[in-house]
């Protein structure tokens, strides 16, 4: 899945760039609207260890297979939903672009575009 990065809003910036390994199978579900949403976990390695990050994608995401190394560009969102115990929340990265790292030029392109948008925002 690859899509364009939305233009930077002047009210603030919410930008995530992840490069890591998919650690859970993709879970796809059909929403009430009829649209498909998919989710998976990706692990990154930091100075303090491995961090697992939940990722949500609009539509199907066939490239997110367990063990695949991906570049994800998106934003952080906290969403609320009803569960058996009441209202629950989940914080996740909403992916705007997902590219396998075996396509390094394409991964570099989406990351560079996101960083250029950030740079433009910081210059204003």
PLM feature spans:
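Single-stranded nucleic acid-binding surfaces, predominantly the OB-fold ssDNA-binding core
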Residues: 1-124
């Amino acid at each position: 899945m690859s899509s364009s990065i939305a233009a930077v809003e002047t009210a603030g910036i919410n930008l995530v760039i992840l490069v890591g390994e998919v650690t859970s199978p993709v879970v796809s579900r059909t929403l009430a609207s009829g649209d498909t949403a998919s989710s998976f976990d990706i692990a990154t390695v930091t100075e303090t260890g491995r961090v697992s990050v939940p990722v949500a994608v609009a539509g199907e995401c066939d490239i997110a297979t367990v063990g695949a190394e991906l570049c994800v560009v998106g934003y952080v969102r906290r969403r609320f939903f009803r569960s058996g115990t009441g209202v629950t929340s989940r914080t996740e990265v909403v992916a705007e672009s997902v590219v396998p790292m075996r396509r390094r030029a394409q991964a570099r392109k989406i990351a560079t575009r996101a960083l250029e948008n950030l740079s433009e925002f910081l210059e204003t």
